[in-house]
Amino acid sequence: MTATCSALRAASLVALAVVGEAAVKVPAPLKAVDPLRASVVSVRITGQEWNWRTPWAKQAPWNRVVTGLVVPGPRILVASAAFGNHLLIEVQKLGRDERWPARVRLADSEGPLALLEVDDPSFWAGLAPLPLAETVPVSGEVKVYRWLSSGQFDAATANVRQVRAARHGLSRVTFTSLDMTSAMEAGDSEVVVGEGKALGLVTSRAGDNLIAMAAPVLRQFLAAAAEPTYRGFARAGLAWQEMVNPALREYLGLLPGEGGVRLTRVLPHGSGAGVLEAGDVLLRVGDAPIDATGHYEHPLYGRLSCAPLFTEGRRPGDSLELGILRNRERLTVHVTLRRMLPEQERVPPYVIGQGPDYVVRGGLVFQELTGPYLTAASEGGRRPAPRLLIAVDREGAVPDPARPRLVVLASVLPDVANLGFQDLRDLIVTKVNGAVIGSLQDLRGAFASPV
């Protein structure tokens, strides 16, 4: 009996050893990760804005969580204007608490789009890109995805109302976009998915209405980012009026049923500069006829604004053929597409990655007029000075080599020496000591050369 038990015990030990050896050599298969969960990540951004009313100070730091889409590289694609004044970027995956540091490889505020990189290879384990759709639907149900701070993978149904042209964030560029309705409180780059492909990234919400940058635009951004030199998005730089007034149409020489819009402004740093003129009637962009309200018929999406025709599928430096009506004569002209940066404008609409420049002299605080300055001037229920709004409307977008910027007396510091002047603010400075002022550099020079 004892010999039998010993034999059984020895056999059991041998069996356990074999099983243990097999367990080491052949690990249990990993649980498959849902492709959607594997392609959507959370991006945590910590940033700090400058105080444009007291330009030597900063505001309190802020934190924001947005959604990122894994794309080939591997990299993370985000549609958000939160990059530029950021201090720290961290990413999370698969609903876990662990955070990895990330950095911006490329950010274009005219998207607004950004590509992030994560150097730690362990972050990419279990993640995979989700294909970007080549086209987007004009109707039907889609899904919107994101990770919640609780670690839950959140999904909501959205109904596509239409595909239309829209601007996103701070951008002045008009893109093809998805217009949807959904109960999700989105607007932070949530991923829109249909038939297993990414259809877009949500950038804004109004009520139950969501606007997403469409996948073809995202594909164009990634293609541009892969080039040795990033060229960005082209923009027309045109303003126009609709041609629905019969008397005006007849005066300009438009035929019955003929479309076209009348150009009211051609910016000197835009794509139409040197070729188009205010008063021209834009009849055609490429092969697309323009109707009397500035729309054209897209082969897939129907009636869209003609503005994206200068941007999508084309890059800065490309030549674009236009049909115009000038002095009752129909002409074919070619323009070279240009990227229009905010710093090229006399009043930059936004400032990214740097604080305000300023000059303090005798307790007087001077700044250059910018979009953030106007925003700060409207805080606390106040309204910006009408003179500033008029200046921005008339001159803000038009570069002037002689006066590249508008300098303003922003405020007066409280001091006994400044009694009686303490209420002066938001005044445009044109001359100091007889010198024309077109920048803070001019102002410094004028103060250094008293009359």
Residue spans for each PLM region:
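A conserved glycine-rich beta-strand in the N-terminal activation segment of trypsin-fold
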Residues: 27-30, 50-80, 98-101, 127-128, ...
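C-terminal cap/linker of serine protease catalytic domains
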Residues: 27-35, 43, 124, 198-256, ...
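Terminal peptide-recognition signature
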Residues: 43, 68, 74, 78, ...
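PDZ/PDZ-like domain segments forming the peptide/carboxylate-binding groove
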Residues: 59, 181-191, 241-291, 381-438
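PDZ domains, with a preference for the canonical peptide-binding region formed by the helix
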Residues: 82, 216, 284-323, 431-451
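Flexible, gly/ser-rich surface segments that form the specificity/activation loops bordering the active-site cleft
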Residues: 106, 125-175, 202-212, 222-232, ...
